[in-house]
From Swiss-Prot:
Expressed by the skin glands. It comes from Bombina variegata (Yellow-bellied toad). GO terms for cellular component: extracellular region. This is Kininogen-2. It is found in: Secreted. The keyword Oxidoreductase does not apply. [Val1,Thr3,Thr6]bradykinin: produces in vitro relaxation of rat arterial smooth muscle and constriction of intestinal smooth muscle. May target bradykinin receptors (BDKRB). Keywords: Amphibian defense peptide, Cleavage on pair of basic residues, G-protein coupled receptor impairing toxin, Secreted, Signal, Toxin, Vasoactive, Vasodilator. GO terms for molecular function: hormone activity; toxin activity.
Length: 96
């Protein structure tokens, strides 16, 4: 097991030091340039699509639409009043 680990470590170490292999693929300025280009493209795409304010992709609708009926639901009350009497550490019981 130790021999296998050492062999893999040496192979990776050798590959990193030869030109045109893993060391060349890890060119930091090039990867930073790609990241900056990706961010520029992303801002351009979002500018072209113009997503309206208040839109959330998680709900798939506008916040104003989902919160529109919130004040109306506060007006509704149960036709009867339920009184819950709870004691610490015990289950609650319903007394009408």
């Amino acid at each position: 097991m130790i021999l296998w680990f050492c062999l893999n470590f040496l192979i990776v170490l050798c590959l990193e030091h030869f030109p045109g292999t893993l060391a060349a693929e890890r060119n930091v300025p090039q990867s930073e340039e790609k990241t900056e280009q990706f961010l520029r493209d992303l801002s351009e795409i979002s500018r072209l699509q113009r997503v309206p304010t208040g839109f959330t992709p998680f709900r798939g609708k506008f916040h104003s639409q989902s919160l529109r009926g919130l004040s109306e639901t506060k007006k509704f009350k149960a036709p009867y009043n339920i009184h819950w009497h709870c004691k610490p550490g015990l289950l609650c019981k319903n007394f009408n």
